[in-house]
């Protein structure tokens, strides 16, 4: 009987020792979800943005600007060439800048740079693209030689202008909402800080 009691005591000590060593061991099995580790280590696509109006318009703008640029690049001869060169610059610039913003917004990369006002950045991009695409399309329509590539470039230029104009309107609304929300947050923060300052003298008088 005594041997059995000693054996039970030895097993209890061994189990408690193993539990302590297991708790203090640095090599613990991770229970972190796989999706969370992927989100921390890699990029994560935002399907809600791509399904929204601004995301769809961004995709349409990139496609239209690219097609307009391809159409203008197929023209081999021009006289005068100023309108063609201007349209080429506008379509290429709009494609690159809008494409970069689309990648940043769809992958939530802009959240890693909170110092930049991205709503205002998007508004400026869409507004300038609307203006310059409209001017470039009018100039190319007035100075083209009625070739198929030039006519196609003009058509896609005006389509891109329309897409950027709608996006400018939506971006303006989003920017106004963000400005109002920021001002409201600043007001609430200022009220909270003022209440804290007013309550400190009373606390000091009670302490004395």
Curated annotation (Swiss-Prot):
The modification Phosphoserine is found at residue 194. It is found in: Membrane. Residues 49-176 form the MARVEL domain. It is a multi-pass membrane protein. The chain crosses the membrane at residues 59-79, 85-105, 123-143, 151-171. Its main location: membrane. One of its GO terms (cellular component) is membrane. InterPro entries: Marvel, MARVEL-CKLF_proteins. It comes from the Eukaryota. Keywords: Membrane, Phosphoprotein, Transmembrane, Transmembrane helix. Residues 1-11 have a biased composition (Acidic residues). Residues 1-38 are annotated as: Disordered. Residues 15-25 have a biased composition (Low complexity). Interacts with PD1L1 and CMTM6. Acts as a backup for CMTM6 to regulate plasma membrane expression of PD-L1/CD274, an immune inhibitory ligand critical for immune tolerance to self and antitumor immunity. May protect PD-L1/CD274 from being polyubiquitinated and targeted for degradation. Belongs to the chemokine-like factor family. This is CKLF-like MARVEL transmembrane domain-containing protein 4. The gene is Cmtm4.
